[in-house]
From Swiss-Prot:
Gene3D superfamilies for the chain: 3.30.2320.80
Role summary: Involved in the maturation of [NiFe] hydrogenases. Required for nickel insertion into the metal center of the hydrogenase.
Name of this chain's protein: Hydrogenase maturation factor HypA
HAMAP family given in the database record: HypA_HybF (MF_00213)
């Protein structure tokens, strides 16, 4: 389960930002999770709840915003959003597409509290 290593890195990044801003705790962690990121949201949530138990993130709430797949068709030029994992242009049915968004996981926002 690579979600464990991803959560470990996420918590380390949260801690780095918290310490850099003299925060005593992290209360909210917001991430963007692309549907093609290869990360399973429920496994990620379980891993986060497990690994946050010690440290500055122990009371943090994880907010996951699922990012749809955004494609640009190289044939017709249309940009479209897809909620499923399909790289076919929904406008002209071409397979010649470029992924613009929906492949990544990103830390978007932290809510920090100071003592």
């Amino acid at each position: 389960m690579h979600e464990y290593s991803i959560v470990t890195a996420l918590i380390e990044e949260c801690e780095r930002h918290a310490f850099a801003n003299n925060a005593s705790k992290v209360s909210r962690v917001e991430i963007k999770l692309g549907i093609l990121s290869g990360v399973e949201p429920e496994l990620l949530r379980t891993a986060f709840e497990t690994f946050k138990l010690e440290g500055i993130c122990r009371e943090a709430n994880l907010v996951m915003n699922i990012q749809p797949l955004v494609l640009r068709c190289l044939d017709c030029g249309q940009s479209t959003e897809h909620s499923e994992r399909s790289v076919i242009c929904s406008h002209c049915q071409s397979g010649q597409t470029k992924v613009l968004d929906g492949e990544d996981m990103m830390l978007m926002q932290l809510e920090l509290e100071q003592a």
